[in-house]
Amino acid sequence: MMIASKFGIGQQVRHKLLGYLGVVVDVDAEYSLDQPNEDDIASNMTLRSAPWYHVVMEDDEGQPVHTYLAEAQITYELSDEHLDNDSMDELSQSIRNQLQAPRLRN
């Protein structure tokens, strides 16, 4: 069975609840970390069987933070330019450029 993901690598997204801007750096077809705690969002089997995303976001000090989010937790980001989060714009553009022009190996 093929699972389709809504978001792609290099795409900018927003956390639905917290509003943080982030960039997708990897996609898992389903939850793939250790067994979650019962009170964790990942304990929901419906969410665990849907795509999960490795997303880089910035904390309140502007430092990059790696997060692991369910597809239900993020939404599309319509703008490609964010003056207050220009490092996320740069990361997104860098990833997309690398995907479009992969390096050849010898």
UniProtKB/Swiss-Prot annotation:
What is the disulfide pattern of this chain? none
Which GO terms of the molecular function aspect are on file? DNA binding
Matching entries from InterPro entries are given as: Hemimethylated_DNA-bd_dom, Hemimethylated_DNA-bd_sf, HspQ
One GO cellular component term? cytoplasm
Protein keywords: Cytoplasm, Stress response
Give the UniProt subcellular location, in the record's own words: Cytoplasm
Fetch the NCBIfam families from UniProt: PRK14129.1, yccV
* Name under which the protein is recorded: Heat shock protein HspQ
